[in-house]
Amino acid sequence: MNFSTILLLAVALAMDAFAVAVAAGFQLRELTGRRIFRLSWHFGLFQALMPVIGWLSGKAVVSYIEAYDHWAAFILLCWIGANMIRESFDTSSDTPQKDPTRGARLILLSLATSMDALAVGFSLAALKVSIILPVVVIGVVALVFTWIGLLLGNRMLSSRKVGKQAELMGGGILILIGVKILHEHNVF
């Protein structure tokens, strides 16, 4: 997997974190450096750790699905992408009610925004991709996108539209990466 694909994957995965960060930034009237750091650090850390967990799990079963690994990666990426696209059209309010940069809420948001990365880690194992570079890129991109999302959300009147558009774009990118994987395996 080349660097541009890894970067696109990282950007797509960071869209959930970005969308939540925009909403959190909109909700937090006083956005301090400490709050920015806490949310950005945790989102980046969880986004980096979840693919490792998925990759390690995937390595255990990769020999059983080797002939179909590209299909597994395609299905997982498309499933994640489709869910992100579906969620981008969700009209229910997802703005946190309490400080999202503290305590259990911070951990739960970090987990929720990084679950897609778990499945991506499994896909990377199926494709026999080294995990080191993707993990670093995914973590750094998530950290930066969270930081930017917090700042944007804090300066906007309505965070919902930008956050949902980011989630829609992220879902589309994941689906395109899935199609690219099939193309690389000469499926079409």
From Swiss-Prot:
Subcellular location: Cell inner membrane
Bilayer disposition of the protein: Multi-pass membrane protein
Position of the signal peptide: none
InterPro entries linked: Mntp/YtaF, Put_MntP
Pfam families listed in its UniProt record: Mntp (PF02659)
Keywords: Cell inner membrane, Cell membrane, Ion transport, Manganese, Membrane, Transmembrane, Transmembrane helix, Transport
Protein name: Putative manganese efflux pump MntP
Entry keyword annotation includes Transmembrane helix: yes
Entry keyword Cell membrane: yes
Function: Probably functions as a manganese efflux pump.
GO cellular component: plasma membrane
TM annotation in the entry: 6-26, 36-56, 60-80, 106-126, 131-151, 168-188
Molecular function (Gene Ontology), one example: manganese ion transmembrane transporter activity
Family (UniProt): Belongs to the MntP (TC 9.B.29) family.
Main location: membrane
Domain of life from the UniProt record: Bacteria
